[in-house]
Amino acid sequence: AKCIKLGASDYLPKPLNGTILMAKSIASLEAKYFRAREQELLKELNLKATTCPLTGIYNRQVVFDKIEECFDDQKKSNKKEFALLSMDIDFFKSINDTYGHPGGDEVLKAVANTLREACGENIVGRVGGEEFIAIIESKKDKTLEEYCESIRKSVIDLSIPFQDNKINITISGGVIKSSEVKDQEEFVNIADERLYKAKEGGRNQFIYS
């Protein structure tokens, strides 16, 4: 039985007795358990490496790797253009000041869930405190403006419960198409500049140029 536990279960003498058969069954079950546990641990490690622990959406590394991949694909195969949305929750500091960090965390989770649902098959991630980026490759027959407007309205419609309160928020965004630039760094920088313009221009809007 000890040899079986050490991996000799496939080399058994004949005839077999009940003790040996039981030991083989136990060894087989143990092997299946450890294989399943190994797969679970690998999934957990992958999840930790690719997602934001608070919101469950992709983290900064995944988002920027995807941007690089999209640019590489476009250069190699003349892939259709894609867009980047750089987004920021309006007045988030005031939310933290009013409701504390637990309230702010609830807002971040609610916005992340809304963006994930609104963006569907597209990549969306949290890249900073209250900052999010979406990479739009598929708009499902919408114009880019219609797509962004649906995101903006989805966030406005949120009424986030926290303790005895309902927190209402808006979001601002800067938008850029891949056809406007030649490299990844410029791509992100211009989107951030447009986000800043959206903030300066009154918030609760997306800027496209």
Where are these regions (language model features)?
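Alpha4 helix (beta4-alpha4-beta5 surface) of REC/receiver domains from two-component response regulators
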Residues: 1-10
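A Lys-centered signature of the CheY-like receiver
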Residues: 14, 126, 199
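Conserved nucleotide-binding and Mg2+-coordinating catalytic segments in signaling enzymes
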Residues: 46-65, 87-101, 109
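Short regulatory alpha-helical coupling segments
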Residues: 46-47, 58-80, 112-119, 137
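Hydrophobic framework residues that shape the active-site pocket
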Residues: 88, 92, 111, 127, ...
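Active-site-proximal alpha-helical element of nucleotidyl cyclase-like catalytic domains
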Residues: 103-123, 131, 150
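A short pre-motif secondary-structure segment
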Residues: 123-126, 167
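Catalytic-core segments of nucleotide cyclases and related cyclic-nucleotide turnover enzymes
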Residues: 145, 163, 176-209
